[in-house]
From Swiss-Prot:
A GO-annotated cellular component: cytosol
GO terms for biological process, alphabetical: CMP-keto-3-deoxy-D-manno-octulosonic acid biosynthetic process; lipopolysaccharide biosynthetic process
Protein name (database record): 3-deoxy-manno-octulosonate cytidylyltransferase
Keyword Magnesium: no
Keywords attached to this entry: Cytoplasm, Lipopolysaccharide biosynthesis, Nucleotidyltransferase, Transferase
Enzyme Commission numbers on file: 2.7.7.38
Pfam annotation, one family: CTP_transf_3
Family label: Belongs to the KdsB family.
Organism per entry: Klebsiella pneumoniae subsp. pneumoniae (strain ATCC 700721 / MGH 78578)
Gene: kdsB
Length: 248
Protein backbone atom coordinates (compact mmCIF):
# COMPACT_ATOMS: atom_id res chain seq x y z
CA UNK A 1 0.00 0.00 0.00
CA UNK A 2 1.01 3.61 -0.51
CA UNK A 3 1.72 6.04 2.33
CA UNK A 4 3.93 8.99 3.19
CA UNK A 5 5.84 9.48 6.45
CA UNK A 6 6.33 12.98 7.83
CA UNK A 7 8.76 13.43 10.73
CA UNK A 8 8.41 16.77 12.56
CA UNK A 9 11.80 17.74 14.02
CA UNK A 10 11.66 20.95 16.02
CA UNK A 11 15.11 22.14 17.10
CA UNK A 12 14.06 23.91 20.30
CA UNK A 13 13.45 21.72 23.35
CA UNK A 14 13.15 22.89 26.94
CA UNK A 15 14.60 19.74 28.49
CA UNK A 16 17.05 18.78 25.73
CA UNK A 17 18.18 21.67 23.50
CA UNK A 18 19.00 20.75 19.92
CA UNK A 19 17.35 17.38 20.42
CA UNK A 20 17.18 16.21 16.77
CA UNK A 21 20.95 16.57 16.42
CA UNK A 22 21.93 14.82 19.64
CA UNK A 23 24.50 12.15 18.80
CA UNK A 24 23.50 8.52 19.24
CA UNK A 25 26.45 6.26 18.55
CA UNK A 26 27.88 8.36 15.74
CA UNK A 27 24.67 9.56 14.07
CA UNK A 28 22.23 12.40 14.85
CA UNK A 29 19.02 11.19 16.45
CA UNK A 30 16.93 12.42 13.52
CA UNK A 31 18.92 10.17 11.17
CA UNK A 32 18.09 7.12 13.32
CA UNK A 33 14.38 8.03 13.02
CA UNK A 34 14.76 8.49 9.26
CA UNK A 35 16.33 5.03 8.95
CA UNK A 36 13.47 3.41 10.89
CA UNK A 37 10.97 5.12 8.61
CA UNK A 38 12.78 3.81 5.53
CA UNK A 39 12.41 0.27 6.86
CA UNK A 40 8.61 0.71 7.03
CA UNK A 41 8.23 0.65 3.25
CA UNK A 42 6.86 4.20 2.99
CA UNK A 43 6.72 5.63 -0.54
CA UNK A 44 8.08 8.97 0.60
CA UNK A 45 9.64 10.28 3.82
CA UNK A 46 9.83 13.98 4.65
CA UNK A 47 11.50 15.57 7.66
CA UNK A 48 9.71 18.80 8.60
CA UNK A 49 12.01 21.16 10.47
CA UNK A 50 12.46 24.82 11.30
CA UNK A 51 16.27 24.68 11.59
CA UNK A 52 18.93 24.68 8.89
CA UNK A 53 21.33 22.45 10.88
CA UNK A 54 18.68 19.73 11.11
CA UNK A 55 18.00 20.08 7.39
CA UNK A 56 21.69 19.68 6.57
CA UNK A 57 21.99 16.54 8.72
CA UNK A 58 18.98 14.95 7.03
CA UNK A 59 20.13 15.84 3.53
CA UNK A 60 23.61 14.47 4.29
CA UNK A 61 21.89 11.16 5.06
CA UNK A 62 20.03 11.27 1.74
CA UNK A 63 16.73 12.40 3.23
CA UNK A 64 14.11 14.87 2.00
CA UNK A 65 13.46 18.05 3.99
CA UNK A 66 10.58 20.51 4.10
CA UNK A 67 11.43 23.74 5.90
CA UNK A 68 8.55 24.91 8.11
CA UNK A 69 7.76 27.93 10.25
CA UNK A 70 9.05 28.04 13.83
CA UNK A 71 5.82 29.38 15.35
CA UNK A 72 3.56 26.32 15.06
CA UNK A 73 1.63 25.55 18.24
CA UNK A 74 1.38 21.81 17.58
CA UNK A 75 2.90 19.02 15.55
CA UNK A 76 -0.30 18.72 13.53
CA UNK A 77 -0.02 22.35 12.43
CA UNK A 78 3.50 21.60 11.18
CA UNK A 79 2.13 18.59 9.27
CA UNK A 80 -0.52 20.79 7.70
CA UNK A 81 2.13 23.15 6.36
CA UNK A 82 3.94 20.22 4.73
CA UNK A 83 0.68 18.86 3.29
CA UNK A 84 0.00 22.22 1.64
CA UNK A 85 3.55 22.77 0.39
CA UNK A 86 3.66 19.29 -1.13
CA UNK A 87 0.08 19.57 -2.47
CA UNK A 88 -0.91 16.09 -1.30
CA UNK A 89 -4.32 14.91 -2.45
CA UNK A 90 -6.97 14.59 0.26
CA UNK A 91 -6.87 10.78 0.21
CA UNK A 92 -3.08 10.52 0.68
CA UNK A 93 -2.25 8.56 3.83
CA UNK A 94 0.21 10.41 6.04
CA UNK A 95 1.96 8.76 9.00
CA UNK A 96 3.40 11.11 11.60
CA UNK A 97 6.47 9.78 13.44
CA UNK A 98 7.90 11.92 16.21
CA UNK A 99 11.46 13.07 15.62
CA UNK A 100 12.50 11.89 19.08
CA UNK A 101 11.62 8.20 18.55
CA UNK A 102 14.87 6.61 17.30
CA UNK A 103 13.73 3.15 18.41
CA UNK A 104 10.29 3.09 16.81
CA UNK A 105 9.63 -0.31 15.20
CA UNK A 106 9.13 0.02 11.42
CA UNK A 107 6.35 -2.59 11.63
CA UNK A 108 4.06 -0.30 13.63
CA UNK A 109 4.62 2.58 11.21
CA UNK A 110 3.19 0.40 8.47
CA UNK A 111 0.54 -1.00 10.83
CA UNK A 112 -1.02 2.39 11.53
CA UNK A 113 -1.08 3.19 7.80
CA UNK A 114 -2.78 -0.12 6.98
CA UNK A 115 -5.29 0.31 9.81
CA UNK A 116 -6.25 3.74 8.53
CA UNK A 117 -6.61 2.46 4.96
CA UNK A 118 -9.03 -0.21 6.20
CA UNK A 119 -11.02 2.25 8.31
CA UNK A 120 -13.63 4.85 7.47
CA UNK A 121 -12.12 7.36 9.91
CA UNK A 122 -9.76 10.17 9.00
CA UNK A 123 -7.23 9.35 11.69
CA UNK A 124 -5.69 6.26 13.33
CA UNK A 125 -3.27 5.57 16.16
CA UNK A 126 -1.92 2.77 18.38
CA UNK A 127 -1.75 1.76 22.02
CA UNK A 128 -0.03 -0.85 24.19
CA UNK A 129 -1.22 -2.67 27.33
CA UNK A 130 -0.19 -1.25 30.69
CA UNK A 131 1.10 -3.84 33.15
CA UNK A 132 2.98 -1.60 35.58
CA UNK A 133 1.13 0.11 38.46
CA UNK A 134 3.46 3.11 38.43
CA UNK A 135 2.73 3.72 34.75
CA UNK A 136 -1.00 3.28 35.33
CA UNK A 137 -1.10 6.25 37.69
CA UNK A 138 1.52 8.38 35.91
CA UNK A 139 -0.07 11.43 34.20
CA UNK A 140 2.72 11.44 31.61
CA UNK A 141 1.46 8.05 30.37
CA UNK A 142 -1.63 8.91 28.33
CA UNK A 143 -4.40 6.33 28.53
CA UNK A 144 -7.04 5.55 25.94
CA UNK A 145 -10.36 3.70 26.07
CA UNK A 146 -12.05 2.32 22.94
CA UNK A 147 -15.49 1.21 21.87
CA UNK A 148 -16.40 -2.26 20.57
CA UNK A 149 -15.34 -1.34 17.02
CA UNK A 150 -11.90 -0.05 17.98
CA UNK A 151 -12.61 3.68 17.96
CA UNK A 152 -11.40 5.97 20.72
CA UNK A 153 -13.93 7.04 23.32
CA UNK A 154 -11.45 9.22 25.22
CA UNK A 155 -7.78 9.90 25.87
CA UNK A 156 -6.67 11.06 29.31
CA UNK A 157 -3.72 11.57 31.62
CA UNK A 158 -5.99 10.18 34.33
CA UNK A 159 -6.28 6.46 34.99
CA UNK A 160 -9.09 5.30 32.71
CA UNK A 161 -11.02 3.10 32.97
CA UNK A 162 -11.04 3.43 36.76
CA UNK A 163 -11.36 -0.09 38.20
CA UNK A 164 -13.51 0.89 41.16
CA UNK A 165 -13.54 -2.40 43.06
CA UNK A 166 -9.92 -3.38 42.37
CA UNK A 167 -8.46 0.03 43.17
CA UNK A 168 -10.55 0.30 46.34
CA UNK A 169 -8.65 -2.74 47.63
CA UNK A 170 -5.18 -2.01 46.26
CA UNK A 171 -3.40 0.00 43.59
CA UNK A 172 -0.52 -2.45 43.39
CA UNK A 173 -2.33 -4.74 40.94
CA UNK A 174 -4.03 -3.12 37.96
CA UNK A 175 -5.58 -5.94 35.93
CA UNK A 176 -5.52 -5.96 32.14
CA UNK A 177 -7.96 -3.22 31.15
CA UNK A 178 -5.55 -0.29 30.75
CA UNK A 179 -3.95 0.87 27.49
CA UNK A 180 -1.21 3.47 27.02
CA UNK A 181 -1.47 5.59 23.93
CA UNK A 182 1.56 5.67 21.61
CA UNK A 183 2.24 9.00 19.90
CA UNK A 184 2.14 7.75 16.32
CA UNK A 185 -0.69 8.84 14.03
CA UNK A 186 -1.99 8.07 10.59
CA UNK A 187 -4.12 10.69 8.81
CA UNK A 188 -5.72 11.24 5.48
CA UNK A 189 -4.29 14.51 4.17
CA UNK A 190 -7.75 16.01 3.81
CA UNK A 191 -8.41 15.31 7.48
CA UNK A 192 -5.28 17.25 8.48
CA UNK A 193 -6.63 20.21 6.50
CA UNK A 194 -9.93 20.00 8.39
CA UNK A 195 -8.26 19.54 11.78
CA UNK A 196 -6.30 22.78 11.60
CA UNK A 197 -9.44 24.70 10.63
CA UNK A 198 -11.07 23.82 13.97
CA UNK A 199 -10.62 25.99 17.04
CA UNK A 200 -8.83 24.31 19.97
CA UNK A 201 -11.27 22.51 22.26
CA UNK A 202 -11.69 22.97 26.03
CA UNK A 203 -10.82 19.31 26.70
CA UNK A 204 -7.54 19.41 24.79
CA UNK A 205 -6.57 22.55 26.69
CA UNK A 206 -7.35 20.93 30.05
CA UNK A 207 -5.53 17.65 29.34
CA UNK A 208 -2.96 19.18 26.94
CA UNK A 209 -3.73 16.43 24.41
CA UNK A 210 -4.36 17.73 20.90
CA UNK A 211 -6.06 14.52 19.73
CA UNK A 212 -9.02 15.41 21.95
CA UNK A 213 -9.92 18.12 19.43
CA UNK A 214 -10.92 15.35 17.03
CA UNK A 215 -13.33 13.75 19.50
CA UNK A 216 -14.69 17.14 20.57
CA UNK A 217 -15.83 17.82 17.01
CA UNK A 218 -17.49 14.42 16.71
CA UNK A 219 -14.92 12.70 14.51
CA UNK A 220 -13.49 9.20 15.00
CA UNK A 221 -9.97 7.98 15.74
CA UNK A 222 -9.23 4.32 15.04
CA UNK A 223 -7.11 2.67 17.75
CA UNK A 224 -5.38 -0.73 17.65
CA UNK A 225 -2.95 -2.54 19.91
CA UNK A 226 0.54 -2.13 18.47
CA UNK A 227 2.12 -5.21 16.90
CA UNK A 228 5.37 -4.32 18.67
CA UNK A 229 6.05 -2.23 21.77
CA UNK A 230 8.16 0.80 20.82
CA UNK A 231 11.44 1.47 22.56
CA UNK A 232 12.34 4.49 24.64
CA UNK A 233 11.54 7.93 23.28
CA UNK A 234 13.90 10.80 24.07
CA UNK A 235 12.59 13.66 26.23
CA UNK A 236 15.41 14.13 28.74
CA UNK A 237 19.20 13.69 28.98
CA UNK A 238 18.53 10.49 30.95
CA UNK A 239 16.40 9.12 28.11
CA UNK A 240 19.19 9.93 25.68
CA UNK A 241 21.74 7.96 27.68
CA UNK A 242 19.35 5.02 27.92
CA UNK A 243 18.82 4.97 24.15
CA UNK A 244 22.54 5.23 23.48
CA UNK A 245 23.09 2.18 25.67
CA UNK A 246 20.28 0.20 24.02
CA UNK A 247 21.48 0.97 20.48
CA UNK A 248 25.16 0.43 21.18
Amino acid sequence: MSFVVIIPARFASTRLPGKPLQDINGKPMIVHVLERARESGADRIIVATDHEDVARAVEAAGGEVCMTRADHQSGTERLAEVVEKCAFSDDTIIVNIQGDEPMIPPAIVRQVAENLAASSSGMATLAVPIHDAEEAFNPNAVKVVMDAKGYALYFSRATIPWDRDRFAQSRETIGDSLLRHIGIYGYRAGFIRRYVSWAPSPLEQIEMLEQLRVLWYGEKIHVAVAAEVPGTGVDTPEDLERVRAELR
